[in-house]
Amino acid sequence: MLILTLPTLGFSTALSLVTTYLPLILERFTSSATLIGFAIGGEGIFSSLIPLWVGVMSDRIWTRRWGRRQPFMIFAAPFMAASLMLAPFQPGYLPIAISTFVFFAAYHFYTSPYQSLLPDVTPAASHGRVMGFQTFMRGGGMFMGMVVAGILFYRWEPLPFILCSILIMVFTYLTVLKIHEPEPELSRLPRREGILSELRRIWQSTRQNKGIQRFLVANFLWESTLAGLRPFIMLYFIYSLGATAQVGALLLGLVGVTYMVAGLASGFLADRYGRMRVMRVGLWVYLGGCLFGVLITDIKWAFVFLPLFGLGGSIVLTLPYAILIRLMPKEHIGQFTGMFSMTRGFANIIAPVVAGAAIDFGGRFLHGGRQYSVIWLLAGLMVAVSLYFFRGAGKDEVVRV
């Protein structure tokens, strides 16, 4: 599982690095926050367009040497690494923005087939644990891309970008070298069709799977909770709870540690007791954490409720793909994995705007910084609605070996 999930550490580090420190370089070439936001927020556009297409393509091919998912990883990794390495050396806003867009395109070209690789090469009884390991690696990547990279960035700005590029290539090489995809049955490979026929087939296969439809709606809501909180969480700490930026960073670090440990544990528990059952518990804990965030007014209480939120959030963001694996037809794993990734992309585009509008609306009734607590009410509402859609996603199964 370590070798299989290593690429997650690489691309998670890269994404955190780009979204955290590249804006500091862009700021030298433009004073427009809108332009900086466009360069970094463009990720949502690529995550809405590429995953489904590349996921379907990875379902339709087979190579004897590299399988069907790994060719996409091999192709995209050099583009991801090169754009990352060259970005801090670019002479102006436009070249940096282009490098960023190349990175985001390669990132989603890489990650959707890679995600589809996980169920291809692991037994059904281990899917929860694999997702737990992946969550742990994703949390480690966030730590490396935000904390470790910050130390390196202030020594020599290009250094974290160069080292992260090397990590991506090394981790991809190790995974491709050590992980061998099983050859699919010829009858399971979808026929190659034209674009219109392919779109019609995707629509029909999605329409036939009511459980997947409901689950994808629920996943969009879960991803939206995080996407809506992320841009405003520090403002909530500072203006609603009266914390300093340093205390806010400490709280986020506490959430990060909880996220990594709980993600690893929830994967093991899901395989033992059932993914749906553990997910339901996580959703109620997550909902409780969100409602607690609305009510508190003292920063001291944040040290209690944020680990609770991190615990529930880790479960809610770790297990969805492990549950989806059980719902997906084997011949369309790439397609539905792509759609799963698209829900995250749509959430990253829509949720921050909705959260910002909710804060502005709340400002009419709440004052003294309390309007930022509305983000927790919105997140709690989305979790509550998701419980309805999740209920129709199917029955639980515990696969034992």
Q: Language-model segments: what does each one mean?
A:
Residues 69-85, 277-292:
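Structural signature of the two symmetry-related core transmembrane helices
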Residues 20-36, 231-248:
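Short amphipathic helix-loop junctions that connect adjacent transmembrane helices
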Residues 88, 168-179, 377-401:
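Multi-pass alpha-helical transporter architecture, strongest
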Residues 51-66, 262-274, 359:
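Helix-to-loop junctions at the C-terminal end of transmembrane segments
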Residues 182-217:
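Juxtamembrane intracellular "pre-TM" segments in multi-pass secondary transporters
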Residues 68-69, 151-166, 357-381:
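A membrane-interface helix-boundary motif in multi-pass transporters
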Residues 47, 128-153, 341-352:
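Glycine-rich segments within core transmembrane alpha-helices of 12-TM secondary carriers
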